[in-house]
Amino acid sequence: DVYKRQELTEEMKKVKAEGTEVEKVVAYCNTNMCVKIKPEELENVAALKVAMKNLAVKYSCNAIAIQCWNALQGEIGIMPCAANSLLNEEGIPVVCETDIHGAITALMVEAAGRNDKRSFFADWTVRHPDNENGELLQHCGPWPISVAQEKPTIGYPLAFSHPGAVEAQAKLGEMTLARFDGDNGEYSLLLGNAKGVEGPYTKGTYVWVEAVSYTHLRAHE
């Protein structure tokens, strides 16, 4: 189902007026994350998180795909990345750029893992500078904080001027690569194994991974 942005912003106003749940989220962020945005901006992050969760409960949604830029910033003044991260940590998958197939993928892999671990939504971006089978998985910051190997930072994204992005490198180790996708009624599922490896620093939430056969994986994505 598709819900209008206005309903989300109205719910944000409502939860900010009520205060209690928003205050809890603000306190959680200050305890578990390095906050490098203004207090009023953090309040908006918290309000967005609470509002999205309320609407998910109201409409019986178990995952969310949000239109994260750029109309939203004109209304609430923040990127939704940190709010997405907080919900992902609670087991409500939230993906960016209204990626419905990404939301379905998140539900599938978390169900396959019996919801014991959180998934993270990433773009498959550039080759590793020193590893022929390496690739950078990165996004503006929607990854759950339990994925991070360090205390995540709420700050500013690389490509936008509004606050609310998250920065952290993910833990290294074995992981599953998955993507459910569709085109004109034809559906497919890409599955692969990879491991996190060391690589250059970058902005956002990121991890460098090594696939067993990069060329084979690329051919089937």
Where are each of the predicted segments found?
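A short, gly/pro- and small-residue-rich
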Residues: 77-93
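Active-site loops and adjacent core secondary-structure elements that bind or stabilize anionic groups
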Residues: 2, 28-53
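Short acidic, glycine/serine/threonine-rich loops at helix termini
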Residues: 12-17, 74-80, 131-136
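Charge-patterned, long linear interaction tracts outside catalytic cores
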Residues: 1, 62-71, 158-166, 176
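C-terminal catalytic subdomain
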Residues: 91-208
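Accessory "access/gating" subregions that flank catalytic or transport cores
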Residues: 41, 45-73
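Conserved small/polar residues in nucleotide/adenosyl-binding loops
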Residues: 2-6, 215-220
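Glycine-rich phosphate/diphosphate-binding loop of Rossmann-like nucleotide-binding domains
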Residues: 4-27
